[in-house]
């Protein structure tokens, strides 16, 4: 099975270490452009753009990077309760047209009650999912060209319609991640691709089976994806050393404050991430080559695959064997790590790469010439 591999745009900050300003770098438009263009050239299928008050706006970032990329797709956030479904449908169609069919959408219900209240959304967990189902039903139908009247508990529209359709027909794909039963019910009914954070394979298999069963009961099939960090090096020893360096500036106070902040979230997925490490930096390898160190201070995706290329590829294939075809990766710093993943991991996987334009570039693709006129030795790809 060919795998879709996406990268990540760190619109909330980037650096060499977690929990410190040492090694941090400015994430301005020029830097985001560097990462997007690297991902585009290296063969990543798309980039996930995060959402929330700690991030730049995902839609504006995506729109700004369309002209400087050629094949890269942009996975941007739909926020039920923050924007109306009909306006979101118009925006989605516009972004798809402007990008010539390179727009994808990630439904985000939110998990931080404090942030949601600041955005004017005062629904509890169950109510947010009720509203998200209503939002998605309307958004899908409008984007597919239907005239929509809808009288729901949370949302009511009359005569909603879209005058200018998207490039992708019947509409761009909808992604979504959530671990609660309400989230799985929504995924089974509404989305094309269900995402999970990087839990151990047995836990991921259980979630996939649950969503697959719920979707089948509605006569639907759902694809599956996973969100993970990657720390890949030429040797396993180098990779584990890099993992330790990433958290080498974390002290107990920083970890404690981060975990206390994340504890207020009502996201089941966030609770499952936190349970993997329990706020303790000992025994962070929670499954072979699956390391929970990132989650000590980072909300959301908190685990990384660690190892050399063949080792990480073997773990990726374990997830693929469960039915996962889409992997959304990231690494610190995101520019350098995009190259490491492409150069050290891609050769060991069947990666579904976007078609590359044929160019007559001046620089040869085989490396630097030896002694001015000798071609470097070629290396077989396994």
Curated annotation (Swiss-Prot):
InterPro entries: Alkanesulphonate_mOase_FMN-dep, Luciferase-like_dom, Luciferase-like_sf, SsuD_RutA_monooxygenase. Its EC number is 1.14.14.5. GO terms for molecular function: alkanesulfonate monooxygenase activity. It catalyses: an alkanesulfonate + FMNH2 + O2 = an aldehyde + FMN + sulfite + H2O + 2 H(+). GO terms for biological process: alkanesulfonate catabolic process. Gene3D superfamilies: Luciferase-like domain. It is an enzyme of class 1 (oxidoreductase). Keywords: Flavoprotein, FMN, Monooxygenase, Oxidoreductase. Catalyzes the desulfonation of aliphatic sulfonates. Belongs to the SsuD family. This is Alkanesulfonate monooxygenase. It comes from Pseudomonas putida (strain ATCC 700007 / DSM 6899 / JCM 31910 / BCRC 17059 / LMG 24140 / F1).
């Amino acid at each position: 099975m060919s795998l879709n591999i996406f990268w990540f745009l760190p619109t909330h900050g980037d650096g060499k270490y977690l929990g410190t300003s040492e090694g941090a770098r400015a994430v301005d438009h020029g830097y985001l452009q560097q990462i997007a263009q690297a991902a585009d050239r290296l063969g990543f299928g798309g980039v996930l753009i995060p959402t929330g008050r700690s991030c730049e706006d995902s839609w504006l970032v995506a729109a700004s990077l369309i002209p400087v990329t050629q094949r890269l797709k942009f996975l941007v956030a739909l926020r039920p309760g923050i924007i109306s479904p009909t306006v979101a449908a118009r925006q989605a169609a516009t972004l798809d047209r402007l990008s010539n069919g390179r727009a994808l959408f990630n439904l985000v219900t939110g998990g931080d009650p404090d942030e949601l209240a600041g955005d004017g959304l005062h629904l509890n967990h169950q109510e947010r999912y009720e509203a998200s189902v209503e939002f998605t039903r309307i958004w899908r139908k409008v984007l597919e060209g239907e005239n929509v009247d809808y009288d729901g508990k949370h949302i009511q529209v009359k005569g909603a319609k879209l005058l200018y359709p998207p490039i992708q027909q019947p509409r761009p794909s909808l992604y979504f991640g959530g671990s609660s039963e309400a989230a799985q019910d929504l995924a089974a009914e509404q989305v094309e691709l269900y995402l999970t954070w990087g839990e151990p394979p047995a836990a991921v298999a259980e979630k996939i089976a649950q969503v697959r069963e719920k979707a089948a009961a509605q006569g639907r099939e759902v694809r599956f994806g996973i969100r993970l960090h990657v720390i890949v090096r030429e040797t396993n020893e180098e990779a584990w050393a890099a993992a330790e360096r990433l958290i080498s500036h974390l002290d107990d106070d920083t970890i404690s404050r981060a975990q206390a902040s994340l504890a207020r979230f009502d996201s089941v997925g966030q609770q499952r991430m936190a349970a993997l490490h329990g706020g303790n930096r000992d025994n962070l390898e929670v499954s072979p080559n699956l390391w929970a160190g990132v989650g000590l201070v980072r909300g959301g995706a908190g685990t990384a695959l660690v190892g050399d290329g063949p080792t990480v590829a073997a773990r990726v294939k374990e997830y693929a064997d469960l039915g996962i075809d889409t992997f959304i990766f990231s690494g610190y710093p995101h520019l350098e790590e995009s190259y490491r993943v492409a150069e050290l991991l891609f050769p060991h996987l069947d990666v579904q790469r976007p078609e590359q334009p044929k160019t007559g570039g001046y620089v040869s693709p085989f490396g630097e010439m030896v002694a001015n006129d000798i071609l470097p030795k070629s290396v077989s790809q396994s």
